[in-house]
């Protein structure tokens, strides 16, 4: 697989019209519930750096990106009225300081009535005439950009749209497969760089080069962690210095295709040693969790299944002693594995709606003692979730068990052995099916 053929443009073009019809149906229902006639979706505006004269990297409104593969286009408006062709007000600023967006082109243009404007003031004449009949979706920090529409992000409509976004169309799934293939290229390059003894910073650069992204185009900041840095869940640095001894490498990094993300984690041992054996065993554990994914399964139950498997592995590895339920109840598994099993994935890496019980906004809380579980819903066909168990030496969490039965269950000598390796996390992106799942990540690595 090469970067120039990760995207199947023909498949995307074939699926896109049905995707737009699905979005129309969702927005028809949302407008009816909100008692409105038109929805206006703002792509977003750049945000200025405090006390400076330049902007932060632009991040688009995910509702806009769900309609259009335009992730770098501020000041655009999508206007949809049921029964009518969607209107795209396409902002093409006349500017010699920055390169304006290219004229609209691609497989998507035939689905829209495209109106190119060169000044923000020209947007208004392409919007519905009665703002009281409109709802506006977007991050509006300048009232002028609302063009008189007062109903901004109404909960009645937003809850319905957010709940529905968890289920992916064929077009969205194809984008995510391509994002997985792109991400796999980066992960292969990163492993090669690790084996060659490169620094975290150098590995990060090799990853970006392999996926064809600038740092700002990544779906999230790459986690590139050598040795003990792998114990920091969202390790945010890329050290220029090489460690005196290379032991382990944890990389959590994704890629984008037309706004849709992959979110992939792998862990590698430098030597063929006991840690390498533990990583292999953990890979088996992760795949056993993937095998439990299917429509109708409560994701919170999967999360607790993971804790039971982690408890067994802790005993097998000599890191703890005790019965499975006792290790969970005493907080031992949470000390080694403090995060959730996974989350919804899509345009947003932590896609919206993971704790929604229905399309009215009912919240499903995570199980007691597991506050960081981002997905608590019953799984449905064509959702895409991450399955990302972890095992880490996080001293502050182990220290919190001092004076409790859980502290005595831990073999602290064995923990000292594992500490220099940091931790293990393995993460796949998995599509939910009626009788099982499609593993987008493993398929991408096999391509």
PLM feature segments, named:
Residues 1-447:
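Active-site neighborhoods and metal-handling regions in enzymes and metal-associated proteins
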């Amino acid at each position: 697989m090469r970067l120039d053929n990760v995207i199947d443009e023909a498949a995307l073009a074939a699926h896109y019209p049905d995707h737009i019809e699905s979005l129309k149906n969702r927005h028809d229902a949302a407008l009816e519930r909100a008692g409105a006639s038109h929805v206006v979706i703002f792509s977003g505006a750049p945000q200025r750096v405090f006390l400076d004269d330049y902007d932060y990297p632009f991040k688009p409104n995910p509702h806009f990106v769900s309609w259009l593969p335009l992730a770098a286009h501020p000041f655009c408006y999508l206007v949809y009225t049921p029964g009518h062709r969607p209107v795209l007000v396409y902002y093409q600023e006349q500017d010699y300081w920055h390169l304006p967006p290219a004229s609209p082109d691609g497989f998507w243009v035939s689905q829209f009535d495209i109106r190119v404007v060169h000044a923000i003031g020209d947007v208004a004449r392409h919007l519905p005439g009665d703002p009281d009949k409109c709802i506006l979706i977007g991050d509006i920090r300048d009232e002028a950009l609302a063009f008189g529409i007062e109903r901004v992000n109404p909960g009645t409509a937003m809850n319905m749209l957010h709940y529905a976004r968890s289920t992916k169309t064929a077009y969205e799934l194809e984008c995510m497969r391509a994002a997985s293939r792109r991400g796999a290229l980066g992960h292969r390059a990163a492993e090669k760089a690790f084996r060659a003894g490169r620094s975290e910073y150098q590995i990060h650069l090799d990853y970006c080069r392999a996926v064809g992204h600038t740092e700002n185009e990544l779906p999230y900041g790459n986690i590139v962690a050598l040795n003990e840095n792998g114990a920091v869940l969202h390790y945010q640095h890329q050290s220029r210095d090489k460690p005196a001894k290379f032991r382990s490498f944890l990389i959590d990094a994704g890629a984008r295709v037309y706004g849709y993300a992959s979110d992939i984690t792998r862990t590698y041992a430098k030597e063929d040693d006991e840690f390498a054996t533990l990583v292999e065993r953990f890979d088996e554990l992760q795949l056993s969790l993937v095998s439990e994914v299917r429509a109708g399964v409560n994701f919170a139950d999967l999360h607790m299944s993971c804790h039971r498997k982690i408890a067994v592995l802790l005993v097998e590895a000599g890191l703890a002693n005790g019965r499975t339920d006792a290790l969970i109840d005493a907080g031992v598994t949470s000390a080694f594995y403090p995060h959730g099993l996974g989350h919804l994935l899509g345009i947003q890496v932590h896609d919206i709606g993971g704790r929604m019980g229905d399309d009215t906004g009912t919240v499903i809380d995570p199980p007691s003692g597991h506050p960081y579980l981002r997905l608590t819903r019953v799984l449905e066909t064509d959702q895409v979730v991450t399955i990302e168990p972890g095992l880490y030496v996080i001293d502050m969490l182990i220290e919190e068990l001092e004076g409790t039965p859980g502290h005595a269950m831990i073999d602290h000598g064995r923990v000292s052995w594992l500490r220099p390796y940091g931790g293990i996390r393995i993460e796949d992106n998995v599509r939910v099916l009626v009788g099982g799942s499609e593993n987008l990540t493993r398929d991408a690595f096999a391509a």
